Amino acid sequence: MDIGKKHVIPKSQYRRKRREFFHNEDREENLNQHQDKQNIDNTTSKKADKQIHKDSIDKHERFKNSLSSHLEQRNRDVNENKAEESKSNQDSKSAYNRDHYLTDDVSKKQNSLDSVDQDTEKSKYYEQNSEATLSTKSTDKVESTEMRKLSSDKNKVGHEEQHVLSKPSEHDKETRIDSESSRTDSDSSMQTEKIKKDSSDGNKSSNLKSEVISDKSNTVPKLSESDDEVNNQKPLTLPEEQKLKRQQSQNEQTKTYTYGDSEQNDKSNHENDLSHHTPSISDDKDNVMRENHIVDDNPDNDINTLSLSKIDDDRKLDEKIHVEDKHKQNADSSETVGYQSQSTASHRSTEKRNISINDHDKLNGQKTNTKTSANNNQKKATSKLNKGRATNNNYSDILKKFWMMYWPKLVILMGIIILIVILNAIFNNVNKNDRMNDNNDADAQKYTTTMKNANNTVKSVVTVENETSKDSSLPKDKASQDEVGSGVVYKKSGDTLYIVTNAHVVGDKENQKITFSNNKSVVGKVLGKDKWSDLAVVKATSSDSSVKEIAIGDSNNLVLGEPILVVGNPLGVDFKGTVTEGIISGLNRNVPIDFDKDNKYDMLMKAFQIDASVNPGNSGGAVVNREGKLIGVVAAKISMPNVENMSFAIPVNEVQKIVKDLETKGKIDYPDVGVKMKNIASLNSFERQAVKLPGKVKNGVVVDQVDNNGLADQSGLKKGDVITELDGKLLEDDLRFRQIIFSHKDDLKSITAKIYRDGKEKEINIKLK
């Protein structure tokens, strides 16, 4: 690649150097832009960036000028190095020829002297090296701070120059040259001081050692001279300087000299082993420059890089001390080896240095990759977080816009919803209250009707007491029997009251004391009574308007479980007007009644069963339904141990038939067939055989006596006939026979009977009139 001024280089090398040059300038520009962003508006910084990128032509021109000057200087340096190498080769050959014939005694003496002074030299050398290390570290810190200050100044100046699109100033180049020259001067001074101190220590040990060290020190000024020449050269950028040194080391590796001697080869091998552990001064310089370059490239990692460089410096100093001690012990052998061993050692030390440089570069690359990956992960996490926040912000913005656009409608809608909920709750409460009121009203109505019926019934129920007995010949205890009971006013005609009660209440007394609910009393007269139905009618007169006629119901329509009220006067006047409540527990009951108290039942009373409380004094009281109408008259209760609330009432329809005859006739005319009979159940076996009764007959009656010219005699009944059916109904006993006959008291029709006579079954008609 022809770059002008009669210089030709490979194209790949040209591109590499151009990239390095542009990289350095871009890095400086980026630093300047980073500082400008803190002080200048975004608009100004963007304009400056555009102007910088437009100045690509000027960059190429500056690069070509810099590269051409660098190549000229390199050619001069190469020529000078060749001259110096030829001169040094001649000197080394003469020194080798002069020292080749030294005896082994010199080496033995040198080894003994070295063993004596080994400990003292180590301590002194360690102190000297530690002081030199501290001085180098301090100078490095000062130089780094100076470089940072200079870079900041450059950034400011570069920012000013970016607006005018000018080239970098000469002041920056001079400061760079001064910093690099000061660094190289400090390194060369440290090397000369170390060599002088080593030479002074060698003079104290022995004269022979002083001669060897003096010969060795003669070579040191050459190094310093070369360093001075390098310092006088025009400074290059850091990457270029590093590459130049690598090329020089490679040139040194190609220089080999053959001096045929097995002993010399063994000594050179020993020296080479030591040289593997000996870091060179140029290695230190390269490391320092590399560290400075890394610090400049990445200002954010200055602290970490400096700490790593300090650790490497300490490790290298320790290795130097150890290797220098061994080097002093084998100084004679190393000098007798000659230039061949020196060149081989330098070759191996150069390889070691290159390996250490490569390892250091790999370590820095790994650290850089690790940091880069960590930064990338952090950037990804930050970007995800920012995206999430942006999404949330977008949602919030959308909601805000929606609210700003439609908030009046939303407020109205919410108000309507709240109003609907409130109205619904109000209507539900109103309906609930209405239902509760309806239920309460229904309950109140029901309760009021019940109470009304009870109060009306109480006005129609009276207390009945017999005053005197008509038959004065009866014993007092018998005359006082059933003295108090209850009665019901079933009809009122003006001031005349017709009261129905039980026959066993009035007894055989004609006059009865009637007491009303208002405690007024009158005397009533018994119009008629019937012991077979246990009913009686009393007539009384009263102008008291509070006494009411009771309403009459229909007992043919009774329902099992129908609620009823019982009103009467239990235990006399003191508890008059007592009301008890119950239900109809049974219908069509046949209740046996003992009227004359001879412990023998006289009649089957047709009644319905109630469970309301009935006590002595309730006989003749009223049983009303839920409408307050009379459906029955209390007649009896079962008074037996362990029996409760089993009472019976005569149906009102039967009562009406009886009281009608009692009002007009004063008695009830029942048909009398003129027979006496026994129950089959009471017959013994002899009596059953006498009447030739079949074994299958279990119930019925046996005619025991027939009146002459009576209805039974006229009908053809004979003594010994067994009657099992009457009027199409099974006949259980004589009470049932009387009940069936009395049930036809009104029509007096003939009824059919099934009988057994002489063991044969037959039917006959019994006349009732």
Swiss-Prot record:
Transmembrane parts of this sequence: 410-430
Subcellular location field: Cell membrane
Keywords, ordered alphabetically: Cell membrane, Hydrolase, Membrane, Protease, Serine protease, Transmembrane, Transmembrane helix
SUPFAM superfamilies (UniProt xref): PDZ domain-like (SSF50156), Trypsin-like serine proteases (SSF50494)
One GO term describing the cellular component: plasma membrane
Biased composition (Basic residues): 1-20
UniProt enzyme class: hydrolase
Residue ranges, compositional bias (Polar residues): 126-137, 247-262, 331-347, 365-390
Biased composition (Basic and acidic residues): 21-64, 71-108, 138-186, 264-287, 348-364
InterPro entries xref list: Chloro_Bact_Ser_Proteases (IPR051201), PDZ (IPR001478), PDZ_sf (IPR036034), Peptidase_S1_PA (IPR009003), Peptidase_S1_PA_chymotrypsin (IPR043504), Peptidase_S1C (IPR001940)
Active site location: 504 (charge relay system), 534 (charge relay system), 619 (charge relay system)
Highest taxon of the lineage: Bacteria
Extent of the signal sequence: none
Topology in the lipid bilayer: Single-pass membrane protein
The UniProt record lists the keyword rRNA processing: no
Stretches for region Disordered: 1-287, 324-390
UniProt domain PDZ: residue ranges: 680-733
Protein name from the UniProt record: Serine protease HtrA-like
Sample GO molecular function, one term: serine-type endopeptidase activity
